[in-house]
Amino acid sequence: MHDKLLIEGKLVAGKGEALAVFNPATGEQIAAIAQADLHQVDAAVLAAESAFAHWGQTTPKTRATLLLQIADAIEENAEAFARLESLNCGKPYHAALNDEVPAVADVFRFFAGAARCLSGSAAGEYLEGHTSMIRRDPVGVVASIAPWNYPLMMASWKLAPALAAGNCVVLKPAEQTPLTTFYLAHLLAEILPAGVVNIVFGRGADIGDALTGHEKVNMVSLTGSIATGAHILSHTASSVKRTHMELGGKAPVIVFDDADIDQVVDGIRSFGFYNAGQDCTAACRLYVQRAVYDKVVEALGNAVATLKMGDPHDETTELGPLITEQQLERVVGFVERAKALPHITVVTGGERVKGQGFYFQPTVLAGAKQEDEIVQKEVFGPVISITPFDDEAQVIGWANASHYGLASSVWTRDIGRAHRLAACLQYGCTWVNTHFMLVSEMPHGGQKLSGYGKDMSMYGLEDYTIVRHIMIRH
């Protein structure tokens, strides 16, 4: 098992405290891995700074060629990545292999092409005797913090655009889920020049703070909780670093009475519970028009009850465990508080699964009110709430009355209504008659407390650049 940091092109053991890494499907410890010490964090940042002097001046073609080599290496090692992601996260192996690893490779391929297509404003004479032009230059050293729900995918979302734009990166995976990142490290060591990517490991409170607060770091990119984002913003405020934040969500799913109910049920069964609901865009906050409310509640409850939980290596398993005992207890707390409300009905699920592992039953809670905690706060587990609504104005108000602003969906056969709602919803993405669909060519990112900045797409590439004006007198 790979467990080494990557610093200045070399794979080295951490010199700090050993952290336990667990298999969520069994609750058993699978490794004890030494985190970096503060000297190693400093060495990683300085290696990135040194490498940037050359890497930042390479041609897009050069960078694209190496990104394509990374994509090839990921595909060639797909089974190894899927095994580690399943072991460390509890994900069904077939989902990691068939859904996530191909998407990771595709992100590197997309940004390999995007690196060669970055455009700027037209040059021109805006002042007599002077010619102006616009450059998009790399930011410099980027500190990237990846989350535990999609360790490999989120690492790719951060590495690919940053490298394509000519930046150097110091990446820290979540302390709970480092295994695929360590495996990636040994591949990157063979492909990239020394120092272009460095990987450190450790707790956020010490290693994360040391990394993001380092004076040589020019930009911090985080996917994580609102609390973590707020902490990093406060921690880095004095150095005025550029920041890129994706901080979670509570996606409203608006179902009108003209929607295809079978399509809705099939979609929410998948999109609300993929990755055990541990997804910032999960279809978790349903608003259903009153005329079809009872029908949707019954059909969705029946469908969700058929989701199969269990062994991640069983090809029929659809739902894995939560990531840690702590996360499981958090989900239990949300559901127990919701169950205590007299107006909420547990349609299916609602309990921790007895036995080994951190499993929670896929859960549908009906009768939730707009002000309920279960409607307002991100649970990050296999739990959806359903609330009836009467008309467009009411549901738009309810959907937007949230601190989050990442993802949303509208289910209707009325194309005019779909356009009206898409124009009004305050979310970074609105899907119509689907949910949870992501492609490398389109941006992903939020507003409000869900953060700012875009992953994927040309917008994601631009986020890792600085716009500069060059004026020449002649």
UniProtKB/Swiss-Prot annotation:
The keyword Methyltransferase does not apply. Pfam families: Aldedh. It is an enzyme of class 1 (oxidoreductase). GO terms for biological process: L-lysine catabolic process; putrescine catabolic process. Signal peptide: none annotated. Catalyzes the oxidation 4-aminobutanal (gamma-aminobutyraldehyde) to 4-aminobutanoate (gamma-aminobutyrate or GABA). This is the second step in one of two pathways for putrescine degradation, where putrescine is converted into 4-aminobutanoate via 4-aminobutanal. Also functions as a 5-aminopentanal dehydrogenase in a a L-lysine degradation pathway to succinate that proceeds via cadaverine, glutarate and L-2-hydroxyglutarate. PANTHER family: ALDEHYDE DEHYDROGENASE-RELATED (PTHR11699). This is Gamma-aminobutyraldehyde dehydrogenase. It comes from Pectobacterium carotovorum subsp. carotovorum (strain PC1).
